[in-house]
Swiss-Prot record:
Subcellular location: Plastid, Chloroplast thylakoid membrane
Family: Belongs to the PetL family.
A Gene Ontology molecular function term of the record: electron transporter, transferring electrons within cytochrome b6/f complex of photosystem II activity
Assembly mode: The 4 large subunits of the cytochrome b6-f complex are cytochrome b6, subunit IV (17 kDa polypeptide, PetD), cytochrome f and the Rieske protein, while the 4 small subunits are PetG, PetL, PetM and PetN. The complex functions as a dimer.
GO CC entries: chloroplast thylakoid membrane; cytochrome b6f complex
Superkingdom in the source lineage: Eukaryota
Function: Component of the cytochrome b6-f complex, which mediates electron transfer between photosystem II (PSII) and photosystem I (PSI), cyclic electron flow around PSI, and state transitions. PetL is important for photoautotrophic growth as well as for electron transfer efficiency and stability of the cytochrome b6-f complex.
Protein name as it appears in the record: Cytochrome b6-f complex subunit 6
Major subcellular location class: plastid
Record-linked PANTHER family: CYTOCHROME B6-F COMPLEX SUBUNIT 6 (PTHR37266:SF1)
Organism (species): Citrus sinensis (Sweet orange)
Transmembrane segments: 4-24
Key word DNA-binding present: no
GO biological process, one term: photosynthesis
Length: 31
């Protein structure tokens, strides 16, 4: 099922980007 696969792929990408932004902000010291 390509729809479910693409959905999980998008979800994984969004989670990765969110984690990267959170880590970046933490290193800068805003959080």
């Amino acid at each position: 099922m390509p729809t479910i696969t693409s959905y999980f792929g998008f979800l994984l990408a969004a989670l990765t980007i969110t984690s990267a932004l959170f880590i970046g902000l933490s290193k800068i010291g805003l959080i």
